[in-house]
């Protein structure tokens, strides 16, 4: 039986605070107190607080999320980013259908309403809990971020309309055969690239996927390494692990297993893995150096890293850095190329190569209807190698 040095950590408790918090404004929430005799647009706007009084019981992030009431026709993020910043001002800007993504309104879960804290100032445990809550909601929603097939049938142009035949995954670099080879339910459209394309996985190898989600990349890797190989998926969200394990039988993937754990504390034995892959997950980790350090630990000498992730190409505006949805939606947590190289070097890796993919701005620009995120982000391939042991 395989043993590992780091036990799976218990789910952290989210710290609470009594400081003023502003709830996210949408058509289906009621974050403002309305003065009698006025309509909703003239309402006096009073911020709600995480605790009504010093003696009241603090609310958890999940409780705060449940407190936001939603109607059947609710559309998350119904207000523009500028309107939210103005604390409730309306906007008549038309909302054009956009490519489904991690920030898609289809799969967006209600998150913590603390939009006053910069990413760098957030407690790591709070960040992990926010990410866990978001992707637990996606896992249990019964659909991927782009519906059944990743297409927006509403028309009006856009990359998911009838004007393109490519699915969301094909736009990320997968070919049609890749998509067709994996059973429904595993491809949730949560990536920003295709690690299989450059991981050079070989038959008989052991592959580890950091943040494996419902298992799409794991099942593709299983086809590459064959029955003599082994694939391990690690995810910190119990709901995702359950969904991935259900997909094992659907894909007849006996050489794939999924383990609950954090990618900074991998439940994997030392020097037991040939290849580490990941797809748009490392940016979500609040302590990235720890992720690379533990990745180095589990790799065999000569083992390699093949990661697809977003990298920051320009400084984020303050409202992006303070937006919880930007943090959990693979935007605000992105690092620069130089910072990533420094962290990989610090972990001990050699042959570090990070190649931004300029063409990725086409789909990244569609991640947010109110802002062109392609001005700040680009998808990149991240490759590195653990030095071989001298015999």
Curated annotation (Swiss-Prot):
CDD domains: AdoMet_MTases
EC category: transferase
Catalyzed reactions per annotation: arsenic triglutathione + [thioredoxin]-dithiol + S-adenosyl-L-methionine + 2 H2O = methylarsonous acid + [thioredoxin]-disulfide + 3 glutathione + S-adenosyl-L-homocysteine + H(+); arsenic triglutathione + 2 [thioredoxin]-dithiol + 2 S-adenosyl-L-methionine + H2O = dimethylarsinous acid + 2 [thioredoxin]-disulfide + 3 glutathione + 2 S-adenosyl-L-homocysteine + 2 H(+); arsenic triglutathione + 3 [thioredoxin]-dithiol + 3 S-adenosyl-L-methionine = trimethylarsine + 3 [thioredoxin]-disulfide + 3 glutathione + 3 S-adenosyl-L-homocysteine + 3 H(+)
Low complexity composition bias: residue spans: 40-65
Region (Disordered): 1-126
Alphabetic keyword roster: Arsenical resistance, Plasmid, S-adenosyl-L-methionine, Transferase
UniProt-listed Enzyme Commission number(s): 2.1.1.137
One annotated GO biological process: response to arsenic-containing substance
Domain of life: Archaea
GO MF, one annotated term: arsenite methyltransferase activity
InterPro entries named in the record: Arsenite_MeTrfase-like, Methyltranfer_dom, SAM-dependent_MTases_sf
Upregulation: By arsenite and antimonite.
Phenotypic consequence of gene deletion: Deletion causes increased sensitivity to arsenite.
Composition-biased stretches (Polar residues): 28-39, 102-116
Family statement: Belongs to the methyltransferase superfamily. Arsenite methyltransferase family.
Function: Catalyzes the transfer of a methyl group from AdoMet to arsenite, producing methylated arsenicals.
NCBIfam families hit by this protein: PRK11873.1
Protein name: Arsenite methyltransferase
Taxonomic lineage from the root: Archaea, Methanobacteriati, Methanobacteriota, Stenosarchaea group, Halobacteria
């Amino acid at each position: 039986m395989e043993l590992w040095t780091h036990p799976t950590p218990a789910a952290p408790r989210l710290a609470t605070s009594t400081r003023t918090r502003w709830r996210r404004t949408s058509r289906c929430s009621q974050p403002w107190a309305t003065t009698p005799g006025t309509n909703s647009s003239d309402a006096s706007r009073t911020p709600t607080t995480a605790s009504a009084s010093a003696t009241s019981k603090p609310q958890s992030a999940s409780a705060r999320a449940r407190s936001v009431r939603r109607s059947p026709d609710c559309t998350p993020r119904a207000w523009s980013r500028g309107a939210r910043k103005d604390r409730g001002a309306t906007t008549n800007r038309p909302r054009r259908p956009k490519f489904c993504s991690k920030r898609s309104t289809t799969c967006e879960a209600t998150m913590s309403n603390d939009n006053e804290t910069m990413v760098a100032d957030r407690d790591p445990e709070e960040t992990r809990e926010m990410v866990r809550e978001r992707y637990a909601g996606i896992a249990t929603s019964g659909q991927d971020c782009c519906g059944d097939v990743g297409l927006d049938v509403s028309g009006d142009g856009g990359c998911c309309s009838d004007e393109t035949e490519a699915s969301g995954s094909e736009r990320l670099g997968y070919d049609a055969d890749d998509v067709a080879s994996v059973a429904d339910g595993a491809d949730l459209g949560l990536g920003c690239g295709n690690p299989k394309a450059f991981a050079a996985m070989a038959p008989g190898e052991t592959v580890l996927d950091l943040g494996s989600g419902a298992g799409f990349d794991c099942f593709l890797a299983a086809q590459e390494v064959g029955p003599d190989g082994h694939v391990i998926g690690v995810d910190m969200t119990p709901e995702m692990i359950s969904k991935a394990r259900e997909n094992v039988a659907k894909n007849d993937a006996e050489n794939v297993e999924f383990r609950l754990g954090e990618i900074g504390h991998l439940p994997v034995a030392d020097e037991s893995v040939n290849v580490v892959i990941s797809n748009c997950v490392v940016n979500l980790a609040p302590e990235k150096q720890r992720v690379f350090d533990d990745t180095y630990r589990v790799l065999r000498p000569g083992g390699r890293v093949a990661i697809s992730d977003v990298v920051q190409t320009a400084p984020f505006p303050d409202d992006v850095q303070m937006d919880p949805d930007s943090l959990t939606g693979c935007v605000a947590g992105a690092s620069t190329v130089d910072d990533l190289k420094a962290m990989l070097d610090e972990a001990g890796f050699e042959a570090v190569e990070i190649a931004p993919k300029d063409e990725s701005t086409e789909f990244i620009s569609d991640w947010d209807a109110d802002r062109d995120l392609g001005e700040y982000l680009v998808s990149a391939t991240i490759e590195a190698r653990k030095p071989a042991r001298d015999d």
